[in-house]
């Protein structure tokens, strides 16, 4: 089968990330084989290629926002039948036995495996996964509208839950790409009286935010007239969230939704002032991975509220260009690879 492969760690280039012919996955007990229709593009793929979130092994097929058709089932599979529409996200497997798993925090399991990082992912014509970590989807939905829900949407939803926001309080979103544009749409449903402010350096992202219902849009270093109770950051760098930290109301929270941060502007942390930026019981929280419950809840919410992502379709053969666009912030909403 055809698949995009990360061969080695380094700057994004055709030598370490390329389209190749690889063996089709062979399913085992409790596993299903999915013919991949589409796979969402995520900044995590860049983090893997460039070494900030190193894969467990190389070469590896990245990609973790997968939608396709079940074409084979292993022994003891009960949840799926051949022909079903199925999806998979970042959570590939967990141990199911540790204290975190038993408490409903499987995202913190020490044996957590990320799809496309610790197991072969979805930038491929076929993908396999255990049935209990796959999600059955209704026929009739366009796969390209579903793919971004499995990471950008699901983890954005988890970030929103972790923000502790209450209806009527101001929510601030830092960066406005695949995840935060969906957070905006979710927040407008769950917290209808909460103004949503978007902070983005790119003026096109600010215009998009306003067109999708944001109450106000600011440049990254622009002071808002009113201060938010919570900020959700999806940028890959340090400066934006920690510059804006001083504008969070007392008792408020910054939630960082990123698997890693780049080192380019790490020295900005030296500018932090305890009194100005951290005092008054402000909190900083990070999002680590995702649970199946997050994805299930989010899919139900999206279906009920008729939320759809903004997305651009990219041919499978142009995955390299899609990641280049993401790296250079030339993207509107989410980007989705069309494979089969």
Where do the PLM segments sit?
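A short acidic, Gly/Pro-enriched loop at the edge of an enzyme's catalytic core
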Residues: 223-231
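Glycine-rich beta-strand-centered segment in the early N-terminal region that forms part
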Residues: 23-39, 52-99, 133, 138-140
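Glycine-rich phosphate-binding loop and adjacent beta-alpha segment
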Residues: 238-308, 339-340
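Mid-domain Rossmann-like dinucleotide-binding core that forms the NAD(H)/NADP(H) cofactor-binding site
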Residues: 139-221
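C-terminal hydrophobic helical "lid"/dimerization subdomain
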Residues: 200, 292-340
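NAD(P)H dinucleotide-binding glycine-rich loop of Rossmann-like/cofactor-binding domains
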Residues: 94-174
């Amino acid at each position: 089968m055809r698949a995009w492969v990360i061969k080695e760690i380094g700057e994004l280039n055709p030598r370490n990330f390329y389209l190749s012919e690889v063996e089709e996955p062979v399913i085992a007990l409790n596993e299903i084989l999915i013919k991949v229709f589409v796979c969402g593009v995520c900044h995590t793929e860049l983090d893997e290629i460039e070494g900030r979130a190193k894969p467990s092994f190389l070469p590896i097929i990245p990609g973790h926002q997968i939608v396709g058709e079940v074409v084979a089932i292993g022994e003891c599979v009960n949840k799926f039948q051949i022909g079903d529409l199925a999806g998979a996200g970042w959570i590939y497997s967990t141990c199911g036995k540790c204290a975190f798993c038993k408490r409903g925090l499987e995202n913190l399991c020490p044996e957590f495996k990320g799809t496309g990082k610790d197991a072969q992912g979805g930038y491929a014509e076929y993908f396999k996964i255990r049935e209990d970590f796959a999600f059955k989807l209704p026929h009739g939905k366009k796969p390209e509208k579903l793919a971004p829900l499995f990471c950008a949407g699901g983890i954005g939803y988890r970030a929103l839950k972790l923000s502790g926001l209450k209806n009527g309080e101001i929510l601030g979103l830092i960066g406005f790409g695949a995840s935060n544009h969906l957070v905006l749409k979710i927040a407008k449903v769950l917290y209808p009286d909460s103004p949503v402010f978007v902070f983005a350096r790119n003026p096109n992202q600010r215009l998009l935010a306003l067109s999708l219902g944001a109450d106000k849009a600011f440049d990254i270093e622009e002071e808002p007239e009113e201060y938010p109770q919570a900020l959700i950051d999806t940028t890959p760098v340090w400066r934006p969230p920690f510059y804006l930290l001083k504008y969070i109301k007392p008792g408020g929270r910054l939630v960082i939704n990123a698997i890693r941060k780049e080192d380019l502007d790490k020295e900005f942390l030296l500018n932090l002032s305890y009194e100005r930026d951290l005092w008054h019981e402000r909190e900083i929280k990070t999002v680590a991975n995702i649970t199946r419950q997050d994805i299930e809840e989010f899919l139900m919410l999206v279906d009920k509220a008729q939320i759809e992502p903004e997305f651009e379709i990219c041919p499978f053969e142009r995955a390299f260009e899609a990641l280049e666009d993401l790296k250079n912030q030339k993207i509107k909403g989410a980007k989705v690879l069309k494979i089969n």
